């Protein structure tokens, strides 16, 4: 599948237009037109090789939202025309205890990153969401409600996913208290999630100017 995007050709280069081919659909794959791809600071770290050696050319982007345009012969979770989200990983071993428990992010063999990674065959480079099309196994994508602002949904695929699991793991809800350290890109989502779950939420911050915003989002203090 011919795809147009933007890539870093080296750790010192700016992003430049880049064309490449997505894989042909496997039986359980879905293909999507990308509508939005958020910019995460980790994209910059990886493109600049600040977290270790990177794979170039690199097409960054792991906060992806789009519309399904094609499905594989055995795909059943999505229909053409539905909205879909893709986050920070696109595959895992599927057989370890973590994967079997639905915790693929903790795959004992290591999950496959959305970009700057090799797919499970050990040779195919994974390209991210700074482009117009994407192909992914349906088990590693999520449904997106039709009534949401897609520009706001894209960051949920990273920042939102980062905050939600600990709240779920500790059963945040009515009768529970949640403390959020800082009210930045991650913190504000933590406040909103905890408040929506019914927990009593407190923000800890060095910036008194953020108190009003915190309370508007549902923090009690």
Task: Name what the model sees in each region.
Residues 88-139:
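Cysteine-cluster motifs in flexible loop/terminal segments that predominantly coordinate metals
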Residues 42-48:
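Cytochrome P450 core scaffold surrounding the K-helix E-X-X-R motif
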Residues 146-221:
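Mid-domain Rossmann-like dinucleotide-binding core that forms the NAD(H)/NADP(H) cofactor-binding site
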Residues 21-22, 55-61, 121-126, 132:
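Short Gly/Pro-enriched turn/cap motifs at secondary-structure boundaries
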Residues 3, 82, 175-176:
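Nucleotide donor/acceptor-binding cores
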């Amino acid at each position: 599948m011919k795809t147009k995007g933007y890539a870093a050709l080296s750790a010192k280069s700016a992003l430049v237009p880049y064309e490449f081919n997505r894989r042909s659909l496997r039986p359980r794959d879905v293909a999507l037109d990308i509508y939005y791809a958020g910019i995460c600071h980790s994209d910059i770290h990886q493109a600049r090789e600040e977290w270790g050696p990177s794979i170039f050319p690199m097409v960054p982007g792991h906060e992806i939202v789009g519309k399904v345009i094609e499905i594989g012969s055995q795909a059943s979770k999505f229909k053409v025309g539905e909205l879909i989200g893709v986050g920070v990983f696109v595959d895992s071993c599927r057989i370890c205890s973590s994967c079997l428990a639905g915790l693929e992010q903790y795959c004992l063999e290591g999950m496959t990153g959305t970009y700057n990674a090799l797919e499970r065959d050990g040779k195919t480079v994974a390209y991210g969401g700074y482009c117009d099309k994407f192909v992914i196994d349906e088990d590693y994508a999520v449904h997106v409600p039709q009534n949401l602002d897609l520009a706001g949904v894209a960051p949920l695929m990273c920042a939102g996913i980062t905050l939600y699991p600990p709240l779920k793991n500790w059963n945040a809800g009515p009768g529970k208290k949640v403390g959020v350290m800082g009210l930045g890109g991650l913190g504000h989502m933590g406040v909103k999630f905890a408040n929506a779950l019914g927990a009593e939420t407190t923000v800890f911050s060095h910036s008194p100017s953020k108190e009003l915003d915190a309370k508007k989002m549902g923090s009690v203090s």
